[in-house]
Amino acid sequence: MTLFHFGNCFALAYFPYFITYKCSGLSEYNAFWKCVQAGVTYLFVQLCKMLFLATFFPTWEGGIYDFIGEFMKASVDVADLIGLNLVMSRNAGKGEYKIMVAALGWATAELIMSRCIPLWVGARGIEFDWKYIQMSIDSNISLVHYIVASAQVWMITRYDLYHTFRPAVLLLMFLSVYKAFVMETFVHLCSLGSWTALLARAVVTGLLALSTLALYVAVVNVHS
């Protein structure tokens, strides 16, 4: 039973990444090592973020939720956008190729570093726990989030981007950076359960993805 539960969680967490890699055409471009390089960049960026947070934003131990402190901590996620831009700038090819390489490498590195050990240790436990299913579903939401963020970075860094599109792209980037903070604050204020919070995050990420996709299609069509 424990191995079956672990297998379900593992498949739910990792197979969408594998399917994305195969169906996006990255395997035809031999982009595996490009994704690995993106993952290494992810590790470097996260190390810099942790050092920055540990230095300037020590852990809040009070009983009251620190909105300003959490907002400032969320601002550090801008480093992820800088890292994604660095990865895409080092890869030659079409826009969609750069976006998928950066997003898939980034999201896979996060999946391995933040969810691999908890799944291996926890999902193989004697007692069944829904939180590991939730963790696996959340990894798929993270994949969509990083694809969206990569597309936004790609659009804003185009030198020929029409000025009419720039405010919309900047707004979507702002929402991507502070989405986690807004969701955490909303969950804290409304005292939402774990499944409700996961559903809310999936809905918000989906709406952000659809908005970014519509803008991406408009940008590509205008510049084609």
Swiss-Prot record:
InterPro entries: TMEM147. The keyword Cell inner membrane does not apply. The keyword Membrane applies. GO terms for biological process: multi-pass transmembrane protein insertion into ER membrane; protein localization to nuclear inner membrane. The chain crosses the membrane at residues 1-21, 35-58, 67-88, 99-124, 130-155, 165-187, 195-216. Keywords: Cell membrane, Endoplasmic reticulum, Membrane, Nucleus, Transmembrane, Transmembrane helix. It is found in: Endoplasmic reticulum membrane; Nucleus membrane; Cell membrane. GO terms for molecular function: ribosome binding. It is a multi-pass membrane protein. One of its GO terms (cellular component) is plasma membrane. Residues 59-66, 125-129, 188-194 are lumenal. Pfam families: DUF2053 (PF09767). Residues 22-34, 89-98, 156-164, 217-224 are cytoplasmic. Belongs to the TMEM147 family. PANTHER family: BOS COMPLEX SUBUNIT TMEM147 (PTHR12869:SF0), SMALL SEVEN TRANSMEMBRANE DOMAIN-CONTAINING PROTEIN (PTHR12869). Component of the back of Sec61 (BOS) complex, composed of NCLN/Nicalin, NOMO (NOMO1, NOMO2 or NOMO3) and TMEM147. The BOS complex is part of the multi-pass translocon (MPT) complex, composed of three subcomplexes, the GEL complex (composed of RAB5IF/OPTI and TMCO1), the BOS complex (composed of NCLN/Nicalin, NOMO and TMEM147) and the PAT complex (composed of WDR83OS/Asterix and CCDC47). The MPT complex associates with the SEC61 complex. Interacts with CHRM3, CHRM1 and AVPR2. Interacts with LBR; promoting LBR localization to the nucleus inner membrane. Interacts with DHCR7. Component of the multi-pass translocon (MPT) complex that mediates insertion of multi-pass membrane proteins into the lipid bilayer of membranes. The MPT complex takes over after the SEC61 complex: following membrane insertion of the first few transmembrane segments of proteins by the SEC61 complex, the MPT complex occludes the lateral gate of the SEC61 complex to promote insertion of subsequent transmembrane regions. Also acts as a negative regulator of CHRM3 function, most likely by interfering with its trafficking to the cell membrane. This is BOS complex subunit TMEM147. The gene is Tmem147.
